[in-house]
Regions:
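N-terminal secretory signal peptides and thylakoid transit peptides that target proteins
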Residues: 2-24
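C-terminal segment of classical bacterial N-terminal signal peptides
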Residues: 26-33
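N-terminal cap/lid segment of alpha/beta-hydrolase-fold proteins
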Residues: 39-94
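Loop/turn elements at helix/coil->beta-strand transitions in domains of secreted/extracellular proteins
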Residues: 97-98, 129, 173-174
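Short beta-strand element of the alpha/beta-hydrolase
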Residues: 97-105
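Cap/lid segment of the alpha/beta-hydrolase catalytic domain
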Residues: 107-116, 133-152
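Short amphipathic alpha-helix adjacent to the substrate-entry channel of hydrolases
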Residues: 114-132
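Primarily recognizes the serine-hydrolase "nucleophile elbow" in alpha/beta-hydrolase
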Residues: 156-192
Length: 192
């Protein structure tokens, strides 16, 4: 067992939370460089719920993807009015050493899908981690669960990621969560 494998094997919940916090403050520059050097495309999109998400019978929001200008020309999209929560997997070319649920931020007003989601996942996949980006429902969009709608999506997403991790041969012990901003708060709620 090499040092990297041993380090992944001994991650505890607290270490994973601290690592996620540190990564959230240090990854963006590395993500841009790593993603440009080895682009990895998502494999598919996985709907979290088989039909309408819980408490969504009366929800009327329309999903909108907004392209924001970026000073360095990078793609910077946000998603508002998420009606169909999804997971977008980015799998490494070789055997995955770990799996990570990536929860973008956006202040619970929108989901910052590119720089806090896809770019992070591309970087992780280029470094041997199976990354799954969560596009979650927003609490102000009229869901019956209100502020707990994003948590319902995160809980379901983590169950799906753990199941897929088992199939990839990674295992639950090497499945962690990384969240940015509001996604970080959501990740912390998952740990309780």
């Amino acid at each position: 067992m090499n040092d990297e494998t041993r380090d992944l094997a001994v991650l505890s919940r607290r270490a994973a939370m601290l690592g996620g916090l540190l990564a959230a403050t240090t990854l963006p520059a590395g993500i841009q460089a790593g993603a440009a050097a080895q682009p990895i495309a998502p494999q598919d999109v996985i709907p979290l719920w088989p039909d309408v998400p819980p408490g969504g019978a009366q929800v009327t929001v329309a999903e909108e993807v907004v392209e924001r200008p970026h000073p360095q020309g990078l793609r910077d999209r946000i998603v508002r009015g998420v009606r169909t929560p999804t997971l977008t997997p980015f799998l490494p070319r070789d055997q995955a050493r770990a799996a990570m649920l990536v929860i973008p931020g956006g202040g619970y007003k929108h989901v910052v899908i590119d720089k806090e989601g896809y770019e992070t996942a591309q970087w992780l996949a280029a470094h041997g981690v199976a990354a799954y980006v969560l596009r979650y429902r927003l609490p102000g969009d009229g869901w019956a669960a209100g502020p707990d709608a994003p948590l319902q999506d995160a809980q379901r997403a983590l169950r799906i990621v753990r199941d897929r991790s088992e199939r990839l041969g990674v295992g639950r012990q090497r499945t962690v969560v990384l969240g940015f901003s509001a996604g970080g708060r959501l990740a912390a709620r998952l740990a309780t």
